[in-house]
UniProtKB/Swiss-Prot annotation:
Gene that encodes it: LysM2
GO MF: chitin binding
Remaining remarks: In plants, chitin acts as a microbe-associated molecular pattern (MAMP) that is recognized by lysin motif (LysM)-containing plant cell surface-localized pattern recognition receptors (PRRs) that activate a plethora of downstream immune responses.
Feature: compositional bias, Low complexity: 88-134
The protein's name: Secreted LysM effector LysM2
Domain of life of the organism encoding this protein: Eukaryota
Signal sequence bounds: 1-24
Organism: Penicillium expansum (Blue mold rot fungus)
Region of interest: Disordered: 88-141
Alphabetical UniProt keywords: Chitin-binding, Repeat, Signal, Virulence
InterPro entries in alphabetical order: LysM1-like, LysM_dom, LysM_dom_sf
Length: 344
């Protein structure tokens, strides 16, 4: 038997009321309190940007409900660390709320009855992972946005640290610190505890193949030669070539405006030695195999040849070959920047 039309209408109204209540309890609007924002770069997507900060795409979307995923707007700030809160709701019947958890979040839930307010929250934090930059140096996480890509040394911010104290500890100027870590602000107002900051960086540009262990650099200027650079920094020419292979074995490709390596963490400054045979101080770097009783030395320049050196010193090419056997029988292995013997 079909129910009376009035009863059908009443049941429909009751059903709609229950559905409305269910929707009201399920579609609770969320509020985001952002603690840290980062600017997206050209080409970033929700997936790639979230992964860069150690977040899932779902968590990123929750922190940025207005983001038009999958694309992001270059230069626009997006929330990376924050709190997601459900708006307050009330109900005359008992209700249960719960929240799911992700690998980088903490959650809480509550069960209430009668007329009450329920809420849930999710707090996200950047994952403590590492990444490898283009310079081969492993970058610890988390780091503040905008940090220089070529950073080679890092410091973990602790309570009580200031930009000035960090710069002093690492013997760097404050302007460099600010340029490497723009997110801290020009007055160090945003130095976030628990984040890594850059305290040393590889300058740019550098020639390809430069040693990854370089700790000291020199900007090649007009008039510079490999010999003049090694003389300035008192390092062996062979080390300079090893650290900067792109310049070539004869310094033919020393590019103006590029930085070259003039020291590594493990290198030591070349020092003069004294020959035991005659007590004459021998400058370095010197030609390997040079005679021990040499009394006069010549620093090989970029335009020098055995013939020109011999002419200047009023000796013969044969003398140079005899006193410096490593130059070869045709005197072709004279190393730029090395000292050779020109008198005994």
């Amino acid at each position: 038997m079909m129910a009376p039309k009035s009863l059908q209408t009443g049941l429909l109204i009751l059903l709609l009321a229950k559905l409305k209540l269910a929707w009201g309890m399920t579609l609770v609007p969320r509020q985001v309190t952002c603690d840290y924002e980062a600017a997206a770069s050209s080409g970033d997507t929700c997936t790639s940007f979230a992964a860069e900060w150690g977040l899932t795409e779902e968590t990123f979307a929750s922190l940025n409900p207005s983001a038009a995923c999958p694309s992001l707007v270059a230069g626009q700030n997006y929330c990376m660390v924050g709190t997601i809160s459900a708006a307050s709701t009330t109900s005359s019947s008992s209700s249960t709320t719960s929240s799911s958890t992700t690998s980088s979040s903490t959650t809480s839930s509550s069960t209430t009855s009668s007329s009450t307010t329920t809420s849930s929250f999710t707090t996200t934090t950047a994952s403590e992972t590492t990444s490898t930059a283009a310079n081969g140096v492993t970058t610890p996480m988390p780091v503040q946005s905008g940090m220089i890509d070529s950073c080679s040394k890092f410091d973990l911010i602790k309570s009580g640290d200031t930009c000035a104290s960090i710069a002093s500890t690492y013997n760097i100027d404050l302007s460099s610190f600010y340029s490497w870590n723009p997110a801290v602000g020009s007055s160090c107002a945003y130095l976030d505890v628990g984040y890594y900051v850059c305290v040393d960086a590889v300058p740019s540009p550098v020639q390809s193949g430069i040693t990854e262990s370089c700790s000291k650099f020199d900007l090649v200027e007009s008039g510079d030669t490999c010999a003049s650079i090694v003389s300035t920094y008192n390092i062996p020419l062979s080390s300079f070539y090893a650290w900067n292979p792109a310049v070539g074995s004869s310094c033919a490709y020393l590019d103006l405006g590029y930085y070259v390596c003039v020291g590594t963490d493990s290198s030591t400054v070349a020092t003069s030695t004294t020959s035991a045979g005659n007590g004459i101080t021998t400058p370095t770097p010197d030609e390997p195999g040079m005679v021990s009783d040499c009394t006069k030395f010549w620093l090989v320049g970029s335009d020098d040849t055995c013939t020109s050196i011999a002419s200047s010193e009023d000796i013969t090419v044969a003398d140079i070959e005899k006193w410096n056997p490593k130059v070869g029988s045709t005197c072709t292995d004279v190393w730029l920047g090395d000292y050779i013997c020109v008198g005994v």
